[in-house]
């Protein structure tokens, strides 16, 4: 259970190919059989001082756990993870894509805390199901965008991916105000067997797109963006996400995972409202966090908040 592309050896190898990440992998076995696996990366931002205060370990998707994993096996896996990463990262965050409710007490016993966090799972078993579940406003936005000349397709070359990256970079600098992966990530993902990058064209320019990863039966939307306001009837962000959803439905994937939609009490979170209209199921599988260095964690959290206000 709880398996996803981010907990595979292929993902670990991909992380290992990136110069700006420090990958890690831990396993617990019963005999020769793996019963649990944690794959993730340590990320740092900026210069030496900022890197020191921004060291965090990210586990995308949450641990891979078999149906019959025991409490002792999971406890052993979590303890090995925290022991090995102590001193390397300030905190560890598991961003769950599946339901870990029955394991929550074990996580908490090992020093992890649970934080509510939303996500959307879209049923892409068929294009008919996708179309039936789309909200009326999304259908209208897609229809008018295509009618007035916008198109979407898989990126044909790295030059197109670079144009998309420039839009993402501007978005993260001005609105998201958190660090974006460097160009190396997008270049290598595009050239990998798992990456699918779609771009939106309008009036001869790339005006948006989405960056996806394809797992066994799920397409994951890692990044998405669009230059809104370029036309009253063209909606690049909507077309970008729909491109990934349509690809999933037409190529045998049963789910499109939006990889996060904010948390309760975040003031409405416009991105969640945007994602909701694609007709997916709102799930709350949350995140587990283990703070390895409380003092540095609180200093880092305060500093990030102040920097966002100053930008």
Where do the PLM segments sit?
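Glycine-centered loop/turn motif at secondary-structure junctions
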Residues: 88-89, 111, 149, 172, ...
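Short catalytic-loop micro-motif centered on adjacent basic/acidic residues
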Residues: 91-94, 153, 257-259
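A gly/proline- and charged-residue-enriched helix-loop-helix capping module
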Residues: 55-102
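A conserved beta-strand-loop-helix scaffold within acyl/acetyltransferase catalytic domains
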Residues: 1-48, 96-233
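Aromatic (often tryptophan-rich) hydrophobic motifs at membrane interfaces
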Residues: 25-27, 64-66, 75-83, 185-294
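Active-site/acyl-donor-binding loops of N-acyltransferases
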Residues: 38-46, 105-129, 253-311
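Short, flexible, mixed-charge acidic loops at enzyme active sites
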Residues: 48-56
């Amino acid at each position: 259970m709880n398996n996803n592309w981010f907990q595979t050896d292929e993902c670990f190898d991909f992380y290992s190919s990136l110069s700006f990440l420090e990958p890690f992998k831990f396993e617990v076995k019963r005999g020769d059989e793996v019963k649990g696996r944690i794959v993730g990366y340590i990320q740092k931002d900026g210069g030496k001082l900022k890197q020191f205060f921004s060291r965090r370990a990210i586990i995308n998707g949450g641990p891979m756990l078999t149906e019959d994993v025991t409490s002792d096996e999971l406890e052993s896996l979590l303890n090995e993870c925290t022991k090995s990463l102590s001193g390397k990262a300030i905190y560890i965050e598991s961003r769950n894509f599946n339901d870990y409710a029955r394991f929550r007490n074990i996580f908490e016993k090992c020093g992890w805390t649970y934080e509510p966090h939303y996500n959307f799972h879209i049923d892409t078993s068929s294009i008919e199901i996708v179309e039936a579940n789309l909200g009326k406003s999304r259908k209208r936005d897609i229809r008018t965008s295509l009618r007035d000349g916008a198109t979407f397709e898989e990126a044909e070359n790295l030059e197109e991916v670079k144009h998309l990256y420039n839009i993402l970079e501007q978005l993260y600098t001005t609105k998201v105000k958190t660090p974006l992966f460097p160009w190396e990530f997008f270049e290598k993902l595009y050239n990998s067997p798992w990456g699918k990058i779609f771009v939106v064209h309008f009036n001869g320019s790339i005006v948006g797109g989405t960056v996806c990863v394809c797992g066994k039966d799920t397409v994951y939307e890692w990044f998405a963006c669009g230059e809104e306001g370029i036309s009253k009837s063209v909606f690049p962000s909507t077309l970008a996400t729909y491109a990934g959803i349509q690809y999933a439905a037409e190529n045998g994937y049963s789910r499109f995972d939006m990889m996060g939609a904010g948390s309760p009490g975040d003031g409405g979170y416009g991105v969640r409202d945007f994602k909701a209209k694609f007709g997916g199921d709102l799930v709350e599988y949350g995140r587990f966090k283990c703070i390895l260095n409380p003092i540095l964690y609180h200093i880092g959290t305060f500093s990030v908040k102040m920097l966002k206000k100053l930008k």
